């Protein structure tokens, strides 16, 4: 079956999903969560095959972490589906209502986007997360995962499709592309008359490929080069907590810290504390000349380091003269993802917030909160640094659009 045929079937199924009541979608997602739990053994066995193949190919540790499933992670995925089931339904929400002087009633109402293509790499959890979010928002979804997770993705998709069938919803509403040839993905990205939106999740190379070759609209972020600026007024203990949580808890996440900027006035006090805490957590440090004057044992940092999304236990460091220098550094090397300031100066905090265009800006809070669930969206399908349609972590609302519904009693314009 061709990718165009699959997409057409998904579009037809999306029409069915768009008509489901909120209660029906909630019950469907609960059933999908139960199906994952029922198939846990099959899914974990499939994931073990993927992990074995990935290790044999020498896959990087960050990628292996994203690929791996276990009982706890699978239970977390099922729990996430149940959380999505209970989220408020954005479909049908009236966001504006007005009666015009001629008596027509004008409403802006949220409706599903239609068919969403998810293009992703070694993240089997995305198969379930994306399916749940797209269906809750009344859409069909075409899932094209990476070859690294093919067995995991098939096992997860089969379980979810069974729940769709049992609810009398066409299983094409959740279409997994098993043909992983690049030309098939290219064809999918050209189907702008069928597919309404593409969302790539993965490495910078994949995302740039999708953005450069798609005729379908794309929401994306290329990478997460996230900074922590420790201001002169920062509380040391607070700044250390933000640094450790942001860098060492899950370095493979796109909201982890990649660069530490420290105000020159506190560098001699803060850097040794930071270095000790990070070394205890096996973080490799690289710094500029001013940083290495305080920490001579660390490696020098290059321009490439400051622009890098390491996704690993590596941190670039730089001493800056003031807030303006920190802002200039972030503008030069940042990726508009997430930036953090540790400060007790409210004026500097406000300048930091107002001076950056990043999708998420944090004041005295960890970069790891740059996540749809943590920010109150309930769940997230991705993070956008594209300013059109959606910006920042994207939840259910980002998978809908507003349209006008006008009700009258025979009014005409002329």
Swiss-Prot record:
SUPFAM superfamilies: ALDH-like
Transmembrane segments: none
Subcellular location(s) of the protein: Cytoplasm
Short name of one Pfam family: Aldedh
Keywords: Amino-acid biosynthesis, Cytoplasm, NADP, Oxidoreductase, Proline biosynthesis
GO MF assignments: glutamate-5-semialdehyde dehydrogenase activity; NADP binding
Gene Ontology CC: cytoplasm
Pathways involved: Amino-acid biosynthesis; L-proline biosynthesis; L-glutamate 5-semialdehyde from L-glutamate: step 2/2
Matches recorded under InterPro entries: Ald_DH/histidinol_DH (IPR016161), Ald_DH_C (IPR016163), Ald_DH_N (IPR016162), Aldehyde_DH_dom (IPR015590), G-glutamylP_reductase_CS (IPR020593), Glu-5-SA_DH (IPR012134), GPR_dom (IPR000965)
EC number: 1.2.1.41
Location, primary (coarse class): cytoplasm
Reaction(s) the record says it catalyses: L-glutamate 5-semialdehyde + phosphate + NADP(+) = L-glutamyl 5-phosphate + NADPH + H(+)
Cytoplasm keyword on record: yes
GO biological process, alphabetically ordered: L-proline biosynthetic process
HAMAP family: ProA (MF_00412)
UniProt family annotation: Belongs to the gamma-glutamyl phosphate reductase family.
Function noted in UniProt: Catalyzes the NADPH-dependent reduction of L-glutamate 5-phosphate into L-glutamate 5-semialdehyde and phosphate. The product spontaneously undergoes cyclization to form 1-pyrroline-5-carboxylate.
Protein name as it appears in the record: Gamma-glutamyl phosphate reductase
């Amino acid at each position: 079956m061709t990718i165009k045929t699959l997409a057409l079937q998904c579009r037809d199924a999306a029409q069915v999903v768009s008509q489901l009541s909120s209660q029906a979608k909630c019950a469907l997602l609960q059933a999908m969560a139960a199906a994952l739990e029922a198939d846990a053994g099959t899914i974990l066995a499939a994931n073990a095959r993927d992990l074995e193949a990935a290790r044999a190919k020498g896959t990087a540790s960050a990628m292996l972490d994203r690929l791996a499933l276990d009982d706890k992670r699978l239970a977390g995925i099922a729990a996430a589906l149940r959380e999505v089931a209970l989220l408020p339904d954005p479909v049908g929400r009236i966001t504006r209502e007005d009666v015009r002087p001629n008596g027509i009633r004008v409403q802006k109402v949220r409706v599903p986007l239609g068919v969403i293509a998810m293009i992703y790499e070694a993240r089997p959890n995305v198969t379930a997360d994306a399916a749940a979010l797209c269906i809750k928002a009344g859409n069909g979804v075409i899932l094209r995962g990476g070859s690294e997770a093919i067995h995991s993705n098939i096992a997860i998709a089969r379980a979810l499709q069974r729940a769709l069938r049992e609810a009398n919803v066409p299983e094409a509403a959740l279409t997994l592309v098993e043909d992983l040839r690049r030309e098939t993905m290219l064809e999918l990205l050209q189907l702008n008359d069928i597919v309404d939106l593409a969302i790539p999740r993965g490495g910078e190379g994949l995302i740039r490929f999708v953005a450069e070759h798609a005729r379908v609209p794309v929401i994306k972020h290329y990478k997460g080069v996230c900074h922590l600026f420790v201001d002169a007024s920062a509380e040391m203990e607070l700044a250390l907590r933000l640094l450790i949580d942001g860098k060492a808890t899950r370095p493979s996440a796109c909201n982890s810290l990649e660069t530490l900027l420290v105000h020159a006035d506190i560098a001699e006090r803060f850097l040794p504390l930071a270095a000790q805490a990070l070394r205890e957590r096996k973080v490799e440090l690289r710094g500029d000349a001013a940083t290495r004057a305080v920490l001579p044992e660390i490696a020098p940092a290059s321009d490439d380091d400051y622009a890098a999304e390491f996704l690993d236990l590596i941190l670039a460091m730089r001493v800056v003269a003031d807030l303006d220098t920190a802002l200039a550094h972030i503008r030069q090397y940042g990726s508009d993802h997430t930036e953090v300031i540790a400060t007790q100066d409210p004026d500097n905090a406000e300048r930091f917030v107002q001076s950056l265009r990043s999708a998420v800006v944090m004041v005295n809070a960890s970069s790891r909160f740059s996540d749809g669930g943590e920010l109150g969206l309930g769940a997230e399908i991705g993070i956008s640094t594209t300013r059109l349609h959606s910006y920042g972590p994207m939840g259910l609302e980002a998978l809908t659009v507003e349209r006008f519904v006008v009700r009258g009693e025979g009014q005409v314009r002329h």
